[in-house]
């Protein structure tokens, strides 16, 4: 596909006009709060930033009092937020315009299905493809829900601006409404006073389902089937997209995730989807006013109508309405039953009363009876629309909404299994045994001994009790809400086969694993570069065990593997991580093929390039050919969720991109000469080995690097920011390796170095180019012909464009000694070298030369939110001197929020 991206067609003039209006409203609101004299300083800061008079700007900010800092920090934090809204509104407008006028754009579903339909196995491809965005609550979503609600109001008002210009909406009323919400934002706390709880995170993410995701997913699948039907394909129960959830089940490094939070997550999701069904059935009740005087119904619908408690005389001749009333009553009873009885299985007793549905399938069957009755009695015109979409929603969301993943660190499983084996007098020192002996013991317990190890009366440790409670809750959830409510358990830091069998032992304890099947799929997560390298041999051996073959066969021959982008990047740098992931996918796919197993990948990507982020379409289509069979899962993290799914139009577009990119990659083999590809891989091996050494020499080999990072970034302030339930580190931070990848990347974004997205790239390429004058031409050829390499370098280009070494230099001044400051000199040299080399390989004269949309976006915002960095630096200085006071420390957090908002992909 060579069609342009939809974003590239955004109306830049319209965005600029709207930003001007929003800026004036913010200016007026600020003047009202502080007066013209104080506001003049804000005007001066904007002028100095635009003119790039950095030293003068820094001096002026140093003169601000703490009280003046409050308003200035808020102003420059809110301005990029308003710019984001304008861009999102225009993207939504462009999406609707392109679709309504049947204009093609990159990733458009109709064009993609046209492409797939030409394949010999098109029916199989279209029927089986499944993309799963998994929403997570990593600590990168810095906005309060209150602020999100207010911005949604502004978003909706801005959508109406074109009507205002056309004169169909009163301009003054529109302006007054907009001013009110801007003033509300200016006077609302931007950050949270208290750290989020897991239950808060669950509730927050449900807002996206209510506002956009349920409708977006349902609409997309309905359209997908319609377009496929036009091409002659009947897809039946195809689910090209389903949703996943980590919140409530991801306890790796998060002690606040328990059996109770897992249950709450499932029940909250159940409540959300049941309420959606109730509302939709209510809509159908109002719509289906068909009278028996004018139409006929089936006996099955008549029986439903007769059981309805709607006894109004006005309904005597409206059996469809009575049938929908009966269905709605059963849904309400289901909701009440699950709320009151929690995870007890649904029971049916007296057939005369309104009883809860025992399953989503039972609910669907009732809807199908109505559809069948309409088809049989000349009512086919009433089927399309709400009824069809509701049936589709039930197929996708069931009574569970999104499948919850469980995740835990492998060391926790080992600790628990060691305790179980010791308490059952099987082996006293399991953890000390060599790998072969561990596997032998675990296999014996899994294949030969049906007993439950935890049944002994020996007192259990707190960690074992907690883990067993979670697994027992998972079993109850599956029994009550269906198998799909929890399908995977991920093992962080998978380093051996025993890591996977240890989880199997824990699952066996609660009846989720036996010799024939695993009701919860065991998913290894390979994170570091070393683990990725070792993953081939681990999986090659694991797939050959008879019990594993049975588990996989019971799972339709699929085995999922999760790939960690964040830790591999922190471990070896951007190039090393990207190449290790690429090779691992290639080789793991081949291992699966050799064993008759479909290996599917779960991509643990973050919002930033340093954590595997970047444009979703390009990321998926640049995966190794053959690595996407028909299923792919990927995490959607932090503020990326809000950016992608904050409103229904943009949500639909991003879901469409995921499905189209996956289908495109499944059927399109980008032509790369096989001999060339072998050569390309050898070149990458050489460059990556060099890049890894350069990266690790600084991060882990330079004795001053640790001190530099903690002095020249707001890492301590980020760690104390109330932006998620998870701690910033698994333990007390004494070295870089102990820091979680997310705050690591977040902090480098704040000081504008964007270190994880490019360091080690420039020198490695330069060394290769200097070896032979023809090597630059080879790299340019690779960039033009190899999608993986093109995507890799395009992401570096994007990261460099968001970095700012002038600002980074000011952060470096926060270091206390010259040796530590020298670390920045090394970073600066590498940054300049990387920029030069990337431009040379791309044959470009400037960064973002082929990304006009992002370039325009940065042009709007950079002059304004650059000011925030200088404010943040001054605030950090004052805090470290003890001059801020406890009541003003949150000012730093406000600036952190603003920078993250301006960059739009903080972690």
UniProtKB/Swiss-Prot annotation:
Report the EC number(s), separated by commas if there are several.
4.1.1.31
**Record's keyword terms, sorted:** Carbon dioxide fixation, Lyase, Magnesium
Identify which cofactors the protein needs according to its UniProt entry: Mg(2+)
Q: In terms of domain of life, where is this protein from?
A: Bacteria
The record's top EC class is lyase
Q: What does this protein do?
A: Forms oxaloacetate, a four-carbon dicarboxylic acid source for the tricarboxylic acid cycle.
Family the entry assigns: Belongs to the PEPCase type 1 family.
Q: Which reaction does it catalyse?
A: oxaloacetate + phosphate = phosphoenolpyruvate + hydrogencarbonate
Provide the GO biological process annotations.
carbon fixation; oxaloacetate metabolic process; tricarboxylic acid cycle
- Protein name, UniProt field: Phosphoenolpyruvate carboxylase
SUPFAM superfamilies membership: Phosphoenolpyruvate/pyruvate domain
Q: Extract the Pfam families matched here.
A: PEPcase
Q: Where is the active site?
A: 138, 570
A single cellular component GO annotation:
cytosol
Molecular-function annotations in GO: magnesium ion binding; phosphoenolpyruvate carboxylase activity
Which InterPro entries does this one have?
PEP_COase (IPR021135), PEP_COase_bac/pln-type (IPR022805), PEP_COase_Lys_AS (IPR018129), PEPCASE_His_AS (IPR033129), Pyrv/PenolPyrv_kinase-like_dom (IPR015813)
What species is given as this protein's source?
A: Streptococcus mutans serotype c (strain ATCC 700610 / UA159)
């Amino acid at each position: 596909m060579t069609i342009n991206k939809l974003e590239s067609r955004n109306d830049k003039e319209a965005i600029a006009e709207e930003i001007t209006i929003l800026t004036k409203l913010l200016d007026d609101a600020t003047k009202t709060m502080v007066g013209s004299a104080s506001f003049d300083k804000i005007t001066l800061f904007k002028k100095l930033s635009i003119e790039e008079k950095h030293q003068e700007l820094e001096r002026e900010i140093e003169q601000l009092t703490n009280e003046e800092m409050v308003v200035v920090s808020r102003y420059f934090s809110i301005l990029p937020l308003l710019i984001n809204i304008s861009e999102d509104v225009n993207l939504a407008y462009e999406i609707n315009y392109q679709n309504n006028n049947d204009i093609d754009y990159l990733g458009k579903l109709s064009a993609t299905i046209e492409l797939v339909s030409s394949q010999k196995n098109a029916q199989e491809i279209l029927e089986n493809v499944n993309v799963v965005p998994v929403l997570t609550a990593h600590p990168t979503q810095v906005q309060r829900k209150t602020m999100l609600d207010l911005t949604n109001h502004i978003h909706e008002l801005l959508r109406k601006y074109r009507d205002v210009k056309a004169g169909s909406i009163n301009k003054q009323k529109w302006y007054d409404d907009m001013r009110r919400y801007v003033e509300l934002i200016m006077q609302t706390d931007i950050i949270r006073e208290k750290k989020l709880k897991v239950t808060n995170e669950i509730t927050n993410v449900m807002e996206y389902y209510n506002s956009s995701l349920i409708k977006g997913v349902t609409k997309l699948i309905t359209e997908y089937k319609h377009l496929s039907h036009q091409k002659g394909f009947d897809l039946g129960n195809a689910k090209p997209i389903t949703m996943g959830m980590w919140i409530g089940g991801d306890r790796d490094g998060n002690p606040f995730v328990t059996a109770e939070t897992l249950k709450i997550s499932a029940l909250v999701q159940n409540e959300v989807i049941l309420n959606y069904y109730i509302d939709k059935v209510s809509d159908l009740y109002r719509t289906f006013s068909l009278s028996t005087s004018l139409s006929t119904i089936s006996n099955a619908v008549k029986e439903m109508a007769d059981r309805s408690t709607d006894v109004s005389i006005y309904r005597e001749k409206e059996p469809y309405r009575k049938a929908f009333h009966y269905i709605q009553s059963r849904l309400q009873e289901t909701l009440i039953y699950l709320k009151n009885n929690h995870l007890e299985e649904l029971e049916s007793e007296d057939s005369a009363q309104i009883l809860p549905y025992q399953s989503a399938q039972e609910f669907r069957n009732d809807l199908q009876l109505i559809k069948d009755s309409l088809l049989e009695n000349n009512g086919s015109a009433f089927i399309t629309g709400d009824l069809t979409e509701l049936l589709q929603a039930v197929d996708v969301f069931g009574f569970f909404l999104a499948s919850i993943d469980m995740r835990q660190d492998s060391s926790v499983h080992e600790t628990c299994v060691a305790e179980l084996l010791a308490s059952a007098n099987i082996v006293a020192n399991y953890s000390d045994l060599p790998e072969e002996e561990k596997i032998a013991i675990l296999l014996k317990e899994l294949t030969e001994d049906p007993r439950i190890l935890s049944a002994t009366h020996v007192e259990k440790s707190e960690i074992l009790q907690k883990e067993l409670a979670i697994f027992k809750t998972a079993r109850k959830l599956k029994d009550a809400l269906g198998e799909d409510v929890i399908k995977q358990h991920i093992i962080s830091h998978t380093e051996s086969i025993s890591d996977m069998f240890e989880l199997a032992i824990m699952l066996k304890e609660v009846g989720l694993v036996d010799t024939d099947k695993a009701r919860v799929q065991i998913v290894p997560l390979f994170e570091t570069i070393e683990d990725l390298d070792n993953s081939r041999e681990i999986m090659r051996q694991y797939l050959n065990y008879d019990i594993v073959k049975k588990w996989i066969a019971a799972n339709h021959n699929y085995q999922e593997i999760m790939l960690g982008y964040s830790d591999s990047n922190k471990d070896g740098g951007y190039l090393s991580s990207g190449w290790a992931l690429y090779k691992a996918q290639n080789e793991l796919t081949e291992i699966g093929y050799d064993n008759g197993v479909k290996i599917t990948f779960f991509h643990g990507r973050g919002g930033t390039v340093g954590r595997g982020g970047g444009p979703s379409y390009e990321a998926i289509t640049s995966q190794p050919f053959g690595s996407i069979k028909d299923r792919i899962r990927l995490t959607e993290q932090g503020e990326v969720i809000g950016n992608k799914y904050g409103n229904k139009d943009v949500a639909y577009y991003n879901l469409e991109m995921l499905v189209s990119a996956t289908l495109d990659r499944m059927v399109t083999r980008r032509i790369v000469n096989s001999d060339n590809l072998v050569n390309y891989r050898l070149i990458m091996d050489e460059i990556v080995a060099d890049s890894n050494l350069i990266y690790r020499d600084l991060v882990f080999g330079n004795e001053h690097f640790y001190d530099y990072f903690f002095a020249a970034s707001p890492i301590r302030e980020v760690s104390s920011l109330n932006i998620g339930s998870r701690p910033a580190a698994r333990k007390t931070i004494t070295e870089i390796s102990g820091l979680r990848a997310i705050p690591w990347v977040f902090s480098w974004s704040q000081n504008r170095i964007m270190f994880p997205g490019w360091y080690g790239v420039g020198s490695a390429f330069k060394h290769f180019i200097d070896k032979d004058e023809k090597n630059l031409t080879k790299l340019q050829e690779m960039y033009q012909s190899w999608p993986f390499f093109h995507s890799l370098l395009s992401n570096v280009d994007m990261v460099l464009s968001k970095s700012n070494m002038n600002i980074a230099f000011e952060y470096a001044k926060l270091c206390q000694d010259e040796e530590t400051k020298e670390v920045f000199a090394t970073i600066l040299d590498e940054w300049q070298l990387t920029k030069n080399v990337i431009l040379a390989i791309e044959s470009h004269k400037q960064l973002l030369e082929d990304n006009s949309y992002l370039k325009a976006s940065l042009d709007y915002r950079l002059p304004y939110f650059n000011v925030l960095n200088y404010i943040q630096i001054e605030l950090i200085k004052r805090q470290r001197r003890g001059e801020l006071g406890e009541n003003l420390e949150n000012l730093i957090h406000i600036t952190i929020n603003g920078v993250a908002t301006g960059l739009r992909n903080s972690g």
